[in-house]
């Protein structure tokens, strides 16, 4: 038996197991199994002997290719790279598979008193996912009661065919399907009366008919400029530095989601429900913009060293979600939402921004006596308007005993011995958007006026007008 693979029963072993279980429990034997009166052994009605692990698992393939070009001169360097990555999963069928293209351009340029840095990255990925559970299709890809691929591989009987040409049309075999052109597309299925009720799905059918694809386009651009102010005005002093730095970044992500769950994937038996057949299409757009301005002074006078920083940051995140889904499709399938019997859609849009100011001073004398103080002032769009600002101070002092003359140990034995005390406050605004505002909802909001049902709107959430920063003190 290969390493990490279950030692599963073959058809003869399973037939004996099932027959003995039925005899011991005094329950009817499924009609596909018979007891040979001469040998005393149980046999299935045909010679089907499927090793589901051999059928479902395959050798995965991964490849990665990269082209890189770099160069530059005395004051300028650049790097350009192209990358291709492809990974085929270890399961037969639609997933998991992953493909990605990436292009990157980096550049650095320096003059006497200013340094510029830029970085541009674009990537495109295409991912096929497998059926893992019955969670939300955006997460796992399945809706309703269904056996996932891995569990089905373990539970399917060896007497069930992996592929079966007779299942292309099952109308005359499945009573509930008589009004539809149901088929299993040539994959093996089982019948309660023949095989018994095992509540599992053919993992090959599930992982081939289920389509769950996500395509992602992402762009990230960053840039910075670092200015040596003293050099710019003609003052060059190695003991004093005054720098201004601006950081800019912007990212944009567009995701396109596609999920198709045909009726057979929904079923854990050969009888099924078209009402669970579902096509979902959606797009997700995310963007993030950041600007940072920082001015720093660093100076040394004798044994005194001081570093002072003042800065401002602003970050804005935007989210735009659009999802449409349709239920119950006629065959042959043409997978567009308007071809569904019932269609639904929803969309959401969010914006989150935070503005911060920061000041910090670090001081040490002879690298023995240490002092640091910081204060932040942050304002968040998630909090109530008149109390959305918070102030968060911190302070620390330290003493390096190992720098004192009376320190009893040699530096080769103890090279650092420091006592430090600190106090600080942290802030948290990790909540949902617009929770300080009343939200009106129109979903199923109806009222009866003299026998006439009227659709309206109503406040659907509780409003807290005192949403402020959550603060935590640290020592």
Question: What do these predicted regions represent?
Answer:
Residues 1-34, 123-192, 417-447:
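A surface-exposed, glycine/aromatic-enriched loop/edge motif typical of exported proteins
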């Amino acid at each position: 038996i290969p390493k990490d693979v279950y030692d599963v029963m073959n058809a003869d072993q399973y037939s004996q197991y099932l027959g003995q279980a039925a005899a011991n429990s005094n329950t009817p034997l499924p009609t596909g199994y018979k007891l040979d009166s001469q040998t005393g052994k149980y046999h299935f009605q045909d010679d089907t002997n499927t090793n589901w692990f051999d059928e479902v698992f395959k050798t995965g393939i991964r490849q990665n290719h990269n082209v890189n070009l770099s160069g530059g001169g005395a004051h300028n360097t650049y790097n350009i790279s192209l990358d291709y990555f492809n990974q085929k999963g270890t399961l037969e069928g639609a997933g998991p598979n992953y493909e990605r293209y990436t292009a990157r351009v980096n550049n650095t340029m320096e003059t006497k008193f200013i340094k510029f840095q830029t970085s541009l990255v674009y990537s495109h990925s295409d991912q096929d996912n497998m059926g893992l559970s019955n969670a939300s299709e955006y997460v796992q890809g399945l809706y309703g009661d269904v056996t996932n691929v891995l569990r089905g591989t373990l539970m399917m009987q060896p007497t069930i065919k992996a592929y079966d040409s007779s299942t292309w049309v099952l109308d005359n075999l499945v009573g509930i399907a008589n009004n539809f052109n149901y088929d299993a597309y040539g994959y093996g299925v089982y019948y309660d009366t023949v095989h018994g009720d095992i509540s599992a799905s053919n993992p090959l059918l599930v992982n081939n008919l289920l389509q769950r694809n996500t395509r992602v386009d992402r762009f990230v651009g960053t840039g910075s400029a670092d200015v040596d102010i003293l050099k710019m005005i003609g003052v060059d002093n190695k003991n004093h530095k005054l720098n201004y730095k601006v950081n800019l970044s912007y990212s944009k992500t567009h995701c396109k989601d596609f999920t198709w769950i045909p009726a057979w994937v929904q079923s854990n038996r050969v009888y099924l429900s078209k009402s669970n057949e579902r096509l979902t299409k959606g797009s997700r757009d995310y963007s993030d913009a950041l600007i940072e301005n920082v001015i720093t002074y660093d100076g040394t006078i004798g044994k005194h060293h001081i570093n002072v920083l003042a800065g401002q940051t602003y970050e804005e995140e935007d989210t735009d979600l659009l999802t449409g889904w349709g239920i119950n499709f006629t065959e042959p399938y043409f997978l567009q939402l308007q071809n569904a019997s019932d269609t639904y859609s929803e969309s959401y849009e969010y914006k989150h921004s935070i503005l911060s100011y920061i000041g910090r001073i670090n001081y040490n004398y002879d690298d023995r006596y240490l002092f640091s103080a910081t204060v932040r002032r942050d304002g968040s769009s998630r909090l109530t308007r008149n109390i959305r600002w918070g102030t968060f101070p911190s302070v620390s002092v330290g003493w390096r005993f190992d720098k004192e003359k009376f320190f009893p140990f040699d530096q080769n034995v103890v090279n650092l011995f420091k006592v430090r005390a600190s106090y600080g406050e942290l802030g948290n605004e990790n909540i949902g958007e617009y929770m300080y505002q009343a939200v009106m909802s129109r979903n199923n909001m109806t009222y009866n006026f003299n026998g006439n049902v009227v659709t309206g709107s109503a406040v659907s959430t509780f409003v807290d007008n005192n949403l402020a920063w959550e603060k935590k003190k640290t020592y």
